[in-house]
From Swiss-Prot:
Keywords assigned by UniProt, alphabetized: Cytoplasm, Heme biosynthesis, Iron, Lyase, Metal-binding, Porphyrin biosynthesis
Species whose genome carries this gene: Mycolicibacterium smegmatis (strain ATCC 700084 / mc(2)155) (Mycobacterium smegmatis)
Gene3D superfamilies reported for this sequence: 3.40.50.1400
Name of the molecule in the record: Coproporphyrin III ferrochelatase
Binding site for Fe(2+): H181, E264
Catalytic activity entry: Fe-coproporphyrin III + 2 H(+) = coproporphyrin III + Fe(2+)
Binding site for Fe-coproporphyrin III: S52, Y121
């Protein structure tokens, strides 16, 4: 087995004010979201000049991946494609085909299973190949990596770094709170009996143990949609209120569900939640996401090596392990539950 290229596949984000509404319309197409709601969310992006950090971070990650590939003696071009904004995956796969790429690995910037974490990226792969036509390259998605040692290590170190920013007298009592993006309960049951929820919970256990925390909380954030539709709970804001009522004086919030600084991190946590904590008199620290650090690039190339050389997956073994799927060819479901 060999690869001619690597495709980094991500969510996408606007890079100018005039791109914000078209981007949000792409994200919510077919979901019947009222325009007033989109305009409200658009304000979050406009607070940052209409620029999501995600595309810039991914470009920096590609540079880091290229450096790691070179360090390991690999000559593998890295392409960049998105679901919801330029560069669109359809255009990228067409360019790969035009450049003579016949077989490529695909790294999705989601560590998780479930529909939005994995199966939707498989759909992106299939759509990209369809757009490229009969000469489209074979695309092999790399596995889910929430339990890779470097994933756990990066977040554990980020928790320690965040703790160090708190007042010294509060560090030992700070409550560790992991967050991940909430999804509707109906979606949570797709692709295998609450797989996403279980994977996030397992990764939280691994990171907490690596960071030296026996106790922690795992909550959800950034829900949207009609209030009558049930989503994964508890919500991080509601949880912070409960902590305040119980006398908590400091929190470390670790956005475990995000490998980069999405708007849900820099707005929902760094602005809204931080303000809520300040109003409650709680010292607040937010752990960094992996973004484009060299260890993240090493993780990506590790996944390629596993596939190329048939190596056993590098995983942190903890109690009650949860399956990691994600690897399949040309957008096919990687588990039977996702084909239902």
């Amino acid at each position: 087995m060999s690869f001619d290229a690597l495709l980094l596949l991500s969510f996408g984000g606007p890079e100018a004010p005039e791109q914000v509404m078209p981007f949000l319309e792409n994200v919510t197409r077919g979901r019947g979201i009222p325009r007033e709601r989109l305009e409200s969310v658009a304000e979050h992006y406009l607070h940052f000049g209409g620029v999501s950090p995600i595309n810039g971070i991914n470009r920096d990650l590609i540079v880091a991946i290229e450096a790691e590939l070179a360090r390991r003696g690999r000559n593998l071009p890295v392409y960049f494609g998105n679901r919801n904004w330029e560069p669109y995956v359809e255009d990228t796969v067409k360019a790969m085909s035009d450049n003579g790429i016949r077989r490529a690995a695909v790294f999705a910037t989601s560590a998780w299973g479930g529909y939005s974490g994995c199966a939707q990226y498989q759909e992106d792969i299939a759509r990209g190949r369809a757009a490229a036509g009969p000469e489209a390259p074979e695309l092999v998605k790399l596995r889910q990596y929430f339990d890779h040692p470097l994933f756990v290590e990066m977040f554990a170190d980020a928790v320690a770094d965040a703790a160090a920013t708190l007042p010294e007298e509060l560090r030992d009592e700070a409550r560790l709170v992991f967050t991940a993006h909430s999804i509707p309960l109906r979606a949570a049951s797709r692709c295998g009996a609450d797989l996403y929820e279980r994977q996030v919970g397992y990764a939280a256990r691994l990171v907490a143990a690596a960071a030296g925390y026996r106790e922690y909380d795992q909550v959800w954030q950034s829900r949207s949609g009609p209030p009558q539709v049930p989503w994964l709970e508890p919500d991080v804001g509601d949880h912070l209120e409960a902590l305040a009522r119980n006398g908590t004086r400091a929190v470390i919030v670790c956005p475990l569900g995000f490998v980069a600084d999405h708007i849900e991190v820099v707005w929902d946590l760094d602005n809204e939640l931080a303000e809520q904590a300040a109003e409650a008199g709680i010292a607040f620290a937010r752990a960094a996401t992996p973004n484009s650090q060299p260890r993240f690039a090493q993780l990506v190339v590790d996944l390629i090596d596993e596939m190329l050389h048939g190596l056993p997956p590098r995983r942190v073994e903890g109690p009650d392990p949860v399956p990691a799927y994600g690897s399949s060819v040309n957008g096919a479901p990687c588990t039977p539950a996702c084909s239902a």
